[in-house]
Amino acid sequence: MKNIHKIFSPEKKGKEKISVVTCYDFSFARILGETPIDSILVGDSLGMVFQGNSSTLPVTLEEMIYHTKVVRRGAPDKFIIADLPFLSYQTSIEEGIRSAGRMMKETDCDAVKIEGGSDFICELVAILKQIGIPVMGHLGLTPQSVHVFGGHRVQGKGEESSAKLLREAVALSESGAFSIVLEMIPAELGKRVSEEVGVLTIGIGAGPDCDGQVLVLNDLLGLDANFQPKFLKKFSNLHSIVKDAIESYHEEVRSGEFPGKDHSF
């Protein structure tokens, strides 16, 4: 278990950016374990990226526990944050405590992430902190509320909505969240929130002035050739690399070139 106060220290504001990557499986987690990346998020975005659903809503707590266990095996020394999925904490404080407790006990993760900034969510964050469960907040485009937003749209564009987001960010910080993800909001709002809250902000489509950034590993590696939101920079083109490798394998099997003597007993 990594030291939360070392990795997510507010003293890093303006000094050292935090790098976070979202991962769902053992093989990629093992690679991440060999890198200097600061933290791994096991996101309920696995519902879309890994399962092929149109949203994160179908993901269950059991599925999140399974994937978080797998990622922990691959990256035993990384600071791992696990999403609590839709309806695993919104129905009551008691349900939120049970879900967060299960996640921590059964996966050996270091923290949980929950979406929203309502009074209910802030109360849950405060209680979880009191019982020893670190919580990362999530504001802006919160995918579990995608139907309320009318799709995956930039949030906080108007004066009223930006003021509301800022109030919620301050409330989350004061309730005990150790960090807040800001997703798909104007860069200027991302800067303002980062300046006004006392904890580190982690942006995804929230501009360069957040205290850190998070991207889904599959996305930054370019595994999906058709996925290109404005906030995404692809640092590789694994779609073409994987496709070329599979086509080469297919051709060598057909021709009889593989397996050769080097691959035979």
Swiss-Prot record:
Pathway: Cofactor biosynthesis; (R)-pantothenate biosynthesis; (R)-pantoate from 3-methyl-2-oxobutanoate: step 1/2
Record text on cofactor binding: Binds 1 Mg(2+) ion per subunit.
EC numbers: 2.1.2.11
Residues engaged in binding 3-methyl-2-oxobutanoate: D44, S45, D83, K113
GO cellular component entries: cytoplasm
Cofactor(s) annotated in UniProt: Mg(2+)
Catalytic activity: 3-methyl-2-oxobutanoate + (6R)-5,10-methylene-5,6,7,8-tetrahydrofolate + H2O = 2-dehydropantoate + (6S)-5,6,7,8-tetrahydrofolate
Top-rank lineage group of the source organism: Bacteria
Entry-linked SUPFAM superfamilies: Phosphoenolpyruvate/pyruvate domain
Active site, renumbered: E183 (proton acceptor)
GO molecular function list: 3-methyl-2-oxobutanoate hydroxymethyltransferase activity; magnesium ion binding
Gene3D superfamilies noted in UniProt: Phosphoenolpyruvate-binding domains
Keyword terms of this UniProt record: Cytoplasm, Magnesium, Metal-binding, Pantothenate biosynthesis, Transferase
Cell compartments where the protein resides: Cytoplasm
Any one GO BP annotation for this protein: pantothenate biosynthetic process
Sites where the protein binds Mg(2+): D44, D83, E115
UniProt family annotation: Belongs to the PanB family.
Subunit-level organization: Homodecamer; pentamer of dimers.
Protein name: 3-methyl-2-oxobutanoate hydroxymethyltransferase
Taxonomic path: Bacteria, Pseudomonadati, Spirochaetota, Spirochaetia, Leptospirales
